[in-house]
């Protein structure tokens, strides 16, 4: 009995020492976030162990967990929910039931998940999109783009763009009773990346008749050109999303070759001919001073890979690499960033770049925010932070869309 208790105690100590992350002082519900973070890190650790033992790949294990949270398209007395396709792209569609004398607003939402995981069918995203449709009396479309590593870039971008272009067709807008002047593209995390890239493409394509009124980017990931930003250093072992996990997922977006994450961890992954792009992600210029702190800027090292991946220099994959002329036509933009988030500086730099070219930007920064908070809005993983961000997002849409 004593030996069993000792072994159990040692296992508990090992678990705590390996998965414990100190919580910042200003974090609300810190004990709950600590538990969620430990669960996330345990899943990541287990997935990596399984991959190393050749039981299953990392992304297969995590995807299996994500799928446990998928929901059916359940309609209610206010909203009709259906799973359908837009030009072969799976979408979940939310249509208000109450009669409207005028055409409705619409939101096209891209879910997060590091390009590798997730779905609009996830409980949290279904809840968010249903809430948005009901609160705004709006048509909402959740896009289920193809996932890596089964499908590498540009599959995700192409799916997102195809779904949006289909929705913007006059006959489709008429079918769903949507006002073509009141359409928003939104997304969180990697979904924020896709929302950004698709909006850039739509607004700069002269052949697309109807344009987007606004875009909403919630803690978006917009670049990996520089993998050693101040927010990367501060949140290297961060809450929910660590630097190693972020690099793992972004690498799988482009390739299965292990040379890429190895180079990314050392900030040596950009091809030799890409130095001209560094000005678009130079945090020593683009970040507000309070976030630069005493960090010293050094350029990424060129040529660490023995081959070049075109996606690493493509603004469709990394929207912060878009030049100023591509940004000038963008619509009203709402960007939300979180202090305790590895991706914080991506959003902050995009705010600066958009404002520099005259785009109207509303920026809200959550001082006690963490990455992925919108994933924690439903039982049993309920956080007040997630509901707060939901309410900020929907309230802003209601006033501006």
UniProtKB/Swiss-Prot annotation:
Enzyme Commission numbers on file: 3.1.1.-
Record-linked InterPro entries: AB_hydrolase_3, AB_hydrolase_fold, Arylacetamide_deacetylase, GDXG_lipolytic_enzyme, Lipase_GDXG_put_SER_AS
Subcellular location: Secreted
Record flagged with keyword Transcription: no
GO terms under cellular component: extracellular region; membrane
Primary residence: secreted
Keyword Cell membrane: no
Signal peptide range in chain numbering: 1-18
Superkingdom of the source species: Eukaryota
Disulfide bond sites: 116-338
Motif Involved in the stabilization of the negatively charged intermediate by the formation of the oxyanion hole: chain residues: 111-113
Keywords for the protein's UniProt record, in alphabetical order: Disulfide bond, Hydrolase, Secreted, Signal
PROSITE patterns: LIPASE_GDXG_SER (PS01174)
Active-site residues, record numbering mapped to chain: 189, 341, 371
Listed Gene3D superfamilies: alpha/beta hydrolase
Molecular functions (GO terms): carboxylic ester hydrolase activity
Recorded family membership: Belongs to the 'GDXG' lipolytic enzyme family.
Matches recorded under PANTHER family: AB HYDROLASE SUPERFAMILY PROTEIN C4A8.06C, ALPHA_BETA HYDROLASE FOLD-3 DOMAIN-CONTAINING PROTEIN
Name of the molecule in the record: Arylacetamide deacetylase-like 2
Provenance organism: Homo sapiens (Human)
């Amino acid at each position: 009995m004593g030996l069993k208790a000792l072994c159990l105690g040692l296992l508990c100590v090992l678990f705590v020492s390996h998965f414990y992350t100190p919580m910042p002082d200003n974090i609300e519900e810190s004990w709950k976030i600590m538990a969620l973070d430990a669960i996330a890190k345990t899943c990541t650790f287990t997935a990596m162990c399984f991959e190393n033992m050749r039981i299953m790949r990392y992304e297969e294990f995590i995807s299996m967990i994500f799928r446990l949270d998928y929901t059916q398209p359940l309609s209610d007395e206010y909203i009709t929910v259906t799973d359908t396709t837009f030009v072969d792209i799976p979408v979940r569609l939310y249509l208000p039931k109450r009669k409207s004398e005028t055409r409705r607003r619409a939101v096209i939402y891209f879910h997060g998940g590091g390009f590798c995981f997730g779905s609009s069918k996830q409980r949290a995203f279904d809840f968010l999109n249903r809430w948005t449709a009901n609160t705004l009396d709006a048509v909402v479309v959740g896009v289920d783009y193809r996932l890596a590593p089964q499908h590498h870039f540009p599959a995700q971008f192409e799916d997102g763009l195809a779904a949006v272009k289909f929705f913007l067709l006059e006959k489709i807008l008429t079918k769903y009773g949507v006002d073509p002047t009141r359409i928003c593209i939104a997304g969180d995390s990697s979904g924020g990346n896709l929302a950004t890239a698709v909006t850039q493409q739509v607004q700069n394509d002269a052949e697309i008749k109807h344009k987007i009124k606004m875009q909403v980017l919630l803690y978006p990931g917009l670049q990996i050109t520089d993998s050693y930003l101040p927010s990367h250093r501060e949140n290297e072992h961060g809450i929910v999303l660590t630097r190693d996990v972020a690099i793992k997922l972004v690498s799988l977006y482009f390739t299965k070759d292990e040379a890429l994450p190895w180079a990314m961890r050392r900030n040596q992954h950009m091809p030799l001919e890409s130095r001209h792009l560094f000005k678009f992600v130079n945090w020593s210029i683009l970040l507000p001073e309070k976030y630069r702190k005493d960090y010293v800027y050094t350029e990424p090292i060129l040529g660490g890979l023995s081959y070049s991946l075109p996606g690493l220099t493509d603004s469709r994959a990394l929207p912060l690499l878009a030049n100023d002329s591509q940004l000038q036509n963008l619509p009203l933009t709402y960007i939300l960033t979180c202090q305790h988030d590895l991706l914080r500086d991506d959003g902050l730099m995009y705010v600066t770049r958009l404002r520099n070219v005259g785009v109207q930007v509303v920026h809200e920064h959550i001082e006690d925010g963490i990455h992925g908070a919108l994933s924690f809005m439903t039982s049993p993983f309920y956080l007040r932070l997630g509901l707060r961000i939901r309410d900020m997002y929907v309230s802003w849409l209601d006033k501006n869309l």
